[in-house]
From Swiss-Prot:
Name of this chain's protein: Glutamate--tRNA ligase
Subunit structure: Monomer.
GO biological process terms held by the UniProt record: glutamyl-tRNA aminoacylation
Predominant location category: cytoplasm
GO cellular component assignments: cytosol
Organism: Rhizobium etli (strain ATCC 51251 / DSM 11541 / JCM 21823 / NBRC 15573 / CFN 42)
Pfam families cross-referenced by the UniProt entry: Anticodon_2, tRNA-synt_1c
Keywords tagged on the record: Aminoacyl-tRNA synthetase, ATP-binding, Cytoplasm, Ligase, Nucleotide-binding, Protein biosynthesis
UniProt keyword annotation of Protein biosynthesis present: yes
EC number: 6.1.1.17
SUPFAM superfamilies: An anticodon-binding domain of class I aminoacyl-tRNA synthetases, Nucleotidylyl transferase
InterPro entries reported in the protein's UniProt record: aa-tRNA-synth_I_cd-bd, aa-tRNA-synth_I_codon-bd_sub2, aa-tRNA-synth_I_CS, aa_tRNA-synth_I_cd-bd_sf, Glu-tRNA-ligase_bac/mito, Glu/Gln-tRNA-synth, Glu/Gln-tRNA-synth_Ib_cat-dom, GluQ/Sye
Sequence motif: 'KMSKS' region, positions: 257-261
Length: 488
């Protein structure tokens, strides 16, 4: 599975987008690439793909870097340390892409499209109504050079799309899926350069992988259908394509796609609750090898030795939190000395922002230190153990409580900047929309978030816990209240 055609040897990359909380799926793909590089004596690099200017933020980029460092992953090159093929942030590489786009236009491999968003949406609606998968219909494909020049001179908004063969299929070999054949008539005329001049993922990742001498592209299976577009771009430019490997997605125990709405998915969630990073990497690494029962406890070095990229399963990797808890417990008991354990606890506590902030909030609410555990322990618990009876003391009827919880959950997802002010504003908006007093809305939230009707201030608590933990607790609270409703 190695590509000996490159003089520099094996080079792989992880290329996350800084558009949200760092996902365990990112750690999963990053670990595979990291182990692959170590297995072949190659280099592992990190690149930030921030072509989505509306959702990418420096704050999320920092969180991504911090999360991957917490996982114990080290990269040879990246936006934080530089390297010979930088910049390693796509927004900083914007001027590099335009000449390649012009080359495709000059060679007749791409064309300018002037279709408006409204026209494209109408096109997709028509296609969906006819039972066809939405894709560009080629309206601008055959515009003459004179027409293009005139429309650009008139100030019309334009994007650049790639041309796709009209017939035949794209046949390639994937490192996991083997031989794959995808008909060209199912492939969209992908936008390569957006109206703002930024490249799309498809354009940028091909150019960057080539310029950074990436030999193997290992990513999630959701990108398998996009390989024809990428192979075509390599052909258009006359470049050697890398080896593609598409890893099965992580799934919940019921085989559904791992989703933040079902289970916590952010790396920060597991870090804040005291999971050991070595245990999380151990857990994820087991997806890439066959291990006998009783031999599951592996260090990063041992994972590297046993890593077997030639025998990967196409079945979804099951993210079993119970197994992670079991493995994390074994790491704490069997791998850490007493001194290491004490050091880990102290480091975790001192670096735990929610705990430190919780102590500050608690200081004005207790008369003796012994009251602190009852008041603030909810900040550290992974599971509050909520029962239907915990909500029975609230004055509102169970049906109303359930309505509040089910309404609040999706509304909180709309918050871009998660802080005390935005949380309060959103909950006040929910109360207004439901026609209820704010205290009626927050009463069940106190119990859902802290496990008690007496706790630290709600908005502060929610801000401290973070979006992932709050999401999980509201989901479990809704399940408990639903049981209360069903028992009536």
């Amino acid at each position: 599975m190695t590509n000996s055609g490159t003089a520099s040897g094996v080079r792989v990359r992880i290329a996350p987008s800084p558009t949200g909380e760092p996902h365990v799926g990112t750690a999963y793909i990053a670990l595979f690439n990291y182990l692959f590089a170590k297995k072949h004596g190659g280099e592992f690099i990190l690149r930030i793909e921030d072509t989505d200017a509306t959702r990418s933020t420096p704050e999320f980029e920092t969180k991504v870097l911090d999360a991957l460092k917490w996982c114990g992953l080290e990269w040879k090159e990246g936006p934080d340390i530089g390297g010979p093929y930088g910049p390693y942030r796509q927004s900083d590489r914007k001027p590099m892409y335009q000449p390649y786009a012009q080359e495709l236009l000059d060679k007749g491999h791409a064309f300018r499209c002037f279709c408006t968003p409204a026209r494209l949406e109408q096109m997709r609606e028509t296609q969906r109504a006819a039972g066809k998968p939405p894709k560009y219909d080629g309206l601008c494909l055959n515009l003459t050079a004179e027409e293009v020049t005139a429309r650009m001179a008139a100030g019309e908004t334009t994007v650049i799309r790639m041309k796709i063969p009209a017939e035949g299929s794209c046949d390639f070999t994937d490192g996991v899926y083997g031989d794959v054949s995808i008909p060209w008539d199912s492939v969209d005329m992908q936008v390569l350069i957006k109206a703002d001049g930024m490249p799309t993922y498809h354009m940028a990742n091909v150019i960057d992988d080539h310029l950074m001498k990436i030999t193997h592209v290992a990513r999630g299976e959701e990108w398998l259908a996009s390989v024809p577009k990428h192979i075509l771009l390599y052909r258009y430019f006359g470049w050697e394509q890398p080896v593609f490997m598409h890893l099965s997605l992580m799934r919940n125990a019921d085989k559904s796609k791992l989703s933040k709405r079902k289970n916590p998915t952010s790396i920060s969630y597991y870090s804040a609750l005291g999971y050991i990073p070595e245990a999380l990497m151990n857990f994820l690494g087991l997806f890439f090898m066959q291990i006998a029962e009783g031999e599951e406890l592996l260090t990063m070095e041992e994972l590297s030795e046993k890593f077997d990229p030639d025998n990967l399963s196409k079945a979804g990797a099951i993210f079993d939190i119970q197994k992670l808890d079991w493995l994390n417990g074994r790491w704490i008991r069997e791998k850490l000395s007493e001194e290491e354990f004490r050091a880990r606890v102290l480091t975790w506590a001192m670096e735990n922002d929610r705990l430190m902030a919780g102590l500050r909030l608690s200081q004005t609410r207790i008369s003796k230190l012994g009251e602190l555990p009852d008041l603030a322990s909810f900040l550290l618990k992974s599971d509050l153990g909520l029962q239907p009876s915990d909500f029975a003391k609230i004055k509102s009827p169970p049906e109303e409580i359930l309505e509040i919880l089910n309404t609040v959950q999706p509304d909180l997802e709309k918050i871009l900047e998660w802080n005390v002010e935005t949380i309060e504003a959103e909950l006040r908006a929910v109360a207004d929309r439901l026609g209820k007093k704010l205290k009626v809305v927050v009463a069940p939230l106190f119990v859902a978030v802290s496990g008690s009707s007496r706790s630290l201030p709600l908005f502060d608590s929610m801000a401290l816990l973070g979006r992932s933990v709050v999401r999980q607790r509201l989901k479990l609270a809704a399940q408990a209240v639903a049981a209360l409703v069903g028992s009536k």
